């Protein structure tokens, strides 16, 4: 697994994300803050990670209603997915014939692996993270009909609302945004304790479930 490059993220944005100590000097994914944590990249190069983070933040921006892709660490989620079996197309039937103009509900039907789609697509977004928000939106509209944008948009939503065990939804900000309590085993105790009250339980991750510490998604990375 490649650990030569890594991101620096704000602890305020990504509460609960594991700190990795590496020898190389970190670079900033977002503006410098008082505290930061370093997260190794497993697939993206540093420039690619900056572009993906900026693009995801335009697809799912934070606003007055709550956090967005930046706070959820979506770029880390996508990096982990591409580094794992999904990025290498382990889960998809990849032999011919390939459908032309397939309906959107069929999902991605191309020959290239997700890794290849991202690598090629990111070439067209060189310098994207240096553009203004208006310029970024215009650039994304230009590629809106491409397989790359379809994957990026899908992965951004996944990274917002996945279980944090997969690298996104940091501190369960996505679940808190929509009021999802997570994969709870039972609500009996809360029903008895808060009977007759308006109650929204704090979300819990798979990692907090019995045996959750043994779950290691994506460990067959190259």
Predicted regions and their residues:
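N-terminal secretory signal peptides and thylakoid transit peptides that target proteins
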Residues: 1-17
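Mature-region segments of soluble proteins
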Residues: 36-37, 47-54, 65-222
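Low-complexity, intrinsically disordered/propeptide-like segments
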Residues: 10-12, 22, 209, 218
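Intrinsically disordered, low-complexity segments enriched in polar/charged small residues
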Residues: 8-9, 29, 33, 141, ...
């Amino acid at each position: 697994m490649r650990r030569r490059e890594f991101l620096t993220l704000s602890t305020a944005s990504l509460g609960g994300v594991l700190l990795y100590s590496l020898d190389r000097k970190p670079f900033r994914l977002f503006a410098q803050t008082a505290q930061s944590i370093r997260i190794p990249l497993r697939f993206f190069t540093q420039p690619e990670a900056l572009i993906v983070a900026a693009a995801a933040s335009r697809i799912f921006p934070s606003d007055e209603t709550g956090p967005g892709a930046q706070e959820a660490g979506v770029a880390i989620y996508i990096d982990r997915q591409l580094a794992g079996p999904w990025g290498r197309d382990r889960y998809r039937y990849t032999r011919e014939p390939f459908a032309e103009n397939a309906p959107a509900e069929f999902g991605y039907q191309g020959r290239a692996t997700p890794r290849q789609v991202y690598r090629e697509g990111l070439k067209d977004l060189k310098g994207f993270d240096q553009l203004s928000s208006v310029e970024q939106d215009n650039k994304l509209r230009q590629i809106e009909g491409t397989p790359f944008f379809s994957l990026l948009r899908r992965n951004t939503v996944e990274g917002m609302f996945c279980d944090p065990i997969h690298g996104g939804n940091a501190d369960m900000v996505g679940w808190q945004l929509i009021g999802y309590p997570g994969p709870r085993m039972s609500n009996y105790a809360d029903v008895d304790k808060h009977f007759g009250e308006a109650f929204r339980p704090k979300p819990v991750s798979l990692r907090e479930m019995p045996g959750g510490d043994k779950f290691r998604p994506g460990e067959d990375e190259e």
